[in-house]
Amino acid sequence: MVHVRRHETRKNSKTQKPEQKSRVDWHRTKRSISQLFDSDEELDSNEELDSDEEHDSGESIDSDEELDISKKSDINELPEKETELKLIKVESQGSNSKHLTNTSNSSADEEQLKETKHNDLPDDEAHPGQAENHHNRHTGQILEEDMEDEYIKPGKRKRLSSVMYDSDESDDSDILIRKASAKHPRRVVEDECSSLEMEQETPEKSSAARKREYHQKLQELSERSRQRRRRNSGRNFEDSEKDSCSGTGEEDEDEDEDDYRYDEDGDDYMIDDFVVRNEEGDDENSNQQGENLTTSQLKLVKQNSLYSFSDHYTHFERVVKALLINAFDESFLETLYAGTRKKSYAKDMLTSLHYLDNRFIQPRLESLVSRSRWKEQYKERVESYSNLNILSKSPENCVCQACGLHRHCKFSVHLSGKLYNIRTMETDDFMSHDKQVFTVGRICVERTRIYHKLKHFKFKLYQDCCLIAKPEEVGDEQVKDTVKRVFNHSKERGWIRKKYDQLQNFLNSADYFQDEKF
């Protein structure tokens, strides 16, 4: 072994011999060392490319760290080898025998170096003969190219350096190394996670925002219901609507004042019917609103005579009761049709009266007239006179005064009676003794009989009620009690049922009346 002290003593000796040229080829040694560095860098770059395509970010960065460590070890080995070569050069100035031993040691070191190269380098660099041939062909340019290649970094290494730079900026190196390697896929996953978090946050809105939305929706709903009520109130049921509006006007105003509450800013908003305080109250409010709509619809149905859930006999009983009340109090029907009476029984009576006129009688009258050729003058005469008397006479071929056709006429129609109001049943004494006589045929006389009975059925029924009420009138008894007593007595006797059956016969006769044959 060569020691440093021996080196210093030999260098400071008095007798110095001229330096002999070393047998070591320094150009070859430098080329081999530079070739070693280049091969290491190429090998590391190839390994990095494979590792980046196949492995994740952690493995790629670990390989970079191992590459840096191997570089540092190679650089550290370089000065040691140079010191050994310097020792060989100094010892060559001594005896030839010692110089030969040093050169032999250096040759042994070179053999060991070649063996390590053979194990570490790929197959093309394990054979020094091929490498020498390659470098001999480029002897003039190889040193400069090697020096330049030492400072050139491949593109892949630049990407890795940027990744390491991004990872150095973070606080937690382990998490960021994983994050930096799988760039695009990890970002997509993170975006999905963030979108899921946003979707989870969307249903978790603040209570104020939800109340605002509910408030806006319910305000729109209330406005629609108001418009619907306005449209319904402006239809063809003016009389019934006047009753309901005038009777419940003050109550509705009080309810509206209770339903509305004012906030600090003075804005009015509805509380009791529309504002939802929590999510569980949605179903309750919707059910309450549905009930309110159904009750309002039922109210309109009751007020409308075209829609009723009562049977025909119930309507007829109410009509009889109304006529009995009017027999004791002649102003009852007038006030009932005027809408001044607000009680429920009065409204039911008004509905039944409309039902009798508009559903029972009027359609049959229109059907009888539409299937005939009656003159308008004859029709008006039949409607104006309440009394009808049909007499037979000697037949004659003449023109029928009802239809204007040439017929075999053998009947004379006598019309008489006072004119009356079809609603209030008040009579008019103007020309009370006037009479009208018409000569008609067989078919027209039958049509006249059915038409007159249906047209004046309610007036005839009122006259019968007046005949029943007069003997039952008591001075001290109230009208309500008297009407109740007379009505129950008439119902027990079967008089109401008898009049109802009579009406049904008239209706059936009008329905099955044969058409006039020409």
UniProtKB/Swiss-Prot annotation:
Region called Disordered, residue ranges: 1-266
Modified residues (Phosphothreonine): 202
InterPro entries (alphabetical): CCDC82, DUF4211
A Pfam family it matches: DUF4211
In-chain residues carrying the UniProt-annotated modification Phosphoserine: 170, 194, 305
Compositionally skewed regions (Acidic residues) per UniProt: 38-67, 191-201, 249-266
Keywords: Coiled coil, Phosphoprotein
Compositional bias per record (Basic and acidic residues), positions renumbered to this chain: 16-27, 68-89, 111-127, 215-225
Higher taxonomy: Eukaryota, Metazoa, Chordata, Craniata, Vertebrata
Bias kind Basic residues: ranges: 1-14
Protein's name according to its UniProt entry: Coiled-coil domain-containing protein 82
Organism: Mus musculus (Mouse)
Polar residues composition bias: residue spans: 92-107
Coiled-coil region(s): 204-232
